């Protein structure tokens, strides 16, 4: 799926930076929202700033950036603004199988200097008390996505080795921990993921939180890829945001983990063990 934005603005007003992924709070940016099932069960948000820094996640009551998709971005600056081009593999997306599909879509652009957010679809009806923004999205008609093939299996092996030496006792020890992550698209909708002896030590560290004299247990955002895919199935909306049915951070050091997510009609399901 190819998407391109031509953003018109005086070059001297462009605000952009090279930062870590999903951190575009102080930059200009463009993005696309994709509701591939047309029922608001999963809305992808994919964007970038003029420097090519990516942002992606699940759109909804709040934008959840724990989901990291694989896609390419190419940017360029012109004398009339900037251009951002996206190349999004269908293998990175979950969608229904069939011809002549209608996907819901919205295009967005953020202006940092003017503190503005521009949508292709204007939410005028929200002023009238209609809170459902995603169900008012525009349509891409006649989409014929390819069927997910079994040879699109993704393997991510890793090996962590450690060596220590105790000079006081004149002893040494070493440790080798292999691990393997398998992502198997059973179909365009169903996804099987297997993690064998997963190593989460390379995941970005958590933000520091105050745990002194707190009434409730601290809640940390899930950053591990195995648990972020399909995370929307284990939470539901409330008036104050998301309510988690399952807090995956309580799973600390599994030997083997298996997850299967899919969709039948308008019913989404997920099983994790």
Range-by-range predicted roles:
Residues 1-273:
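Structural preference for beta-rich elements and adjacent junctions enriched in aromatics
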């Amino acid at each position: 799926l190819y998407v391109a934005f031509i953003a018109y603005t005086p070059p001297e007003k462009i605000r952009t930076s090279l930062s870590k992924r999903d951190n575009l709070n102080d930059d200009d940016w463009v993005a696309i929202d994709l509701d591939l099932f047309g029922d608001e069960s999963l809305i992808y948000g994919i964007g970038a700033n003029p420097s090519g820094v990516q942002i992606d996640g699940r759109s909804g009551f709040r934008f959840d950036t724990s989901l990291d998709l694989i896609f390419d971005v190419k940017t360029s600056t012109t004398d009339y603004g900037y251009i951002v081009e996206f190349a999004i593999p269908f293998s990175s997306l979950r969608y229904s199988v069939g011809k002549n599909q209608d996907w819901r879509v919205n295009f967005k652009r953020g202006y940092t200097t003017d503190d503005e957010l521009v949508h292709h679809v204007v939410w005028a009806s929200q002023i009238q008390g209609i809170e459902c923004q995603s169900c008012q999205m525009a349509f891409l008609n006649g989409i014929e996505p390819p069927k997910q093939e079994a040879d699109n299996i993704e393997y991510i092996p890793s090996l962590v080795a450690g060596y220590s030496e105790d000079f006081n006792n004149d002893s040494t020890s070493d440790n080798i921990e292999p691990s393997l992550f398998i992502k198997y698209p059973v179909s365009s909708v169903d996804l099987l993921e297997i993690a064998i002896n997963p190593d989460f030590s390379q995941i970005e560290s958590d933000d520091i939180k105050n745990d002194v004299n707190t009434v409730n247990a601290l809640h940390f955002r899930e950053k591990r890829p195995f648990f972020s895919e399909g995370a929307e199935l284990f939470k539901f909306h409330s008036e104050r945001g998301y309510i988690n049915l399952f807090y995956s951070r309580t799973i600390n050091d599994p030997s083997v983990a298996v997850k299967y997510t899919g969709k039948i009609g308008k019913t989404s399901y997920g099983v994790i063990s």
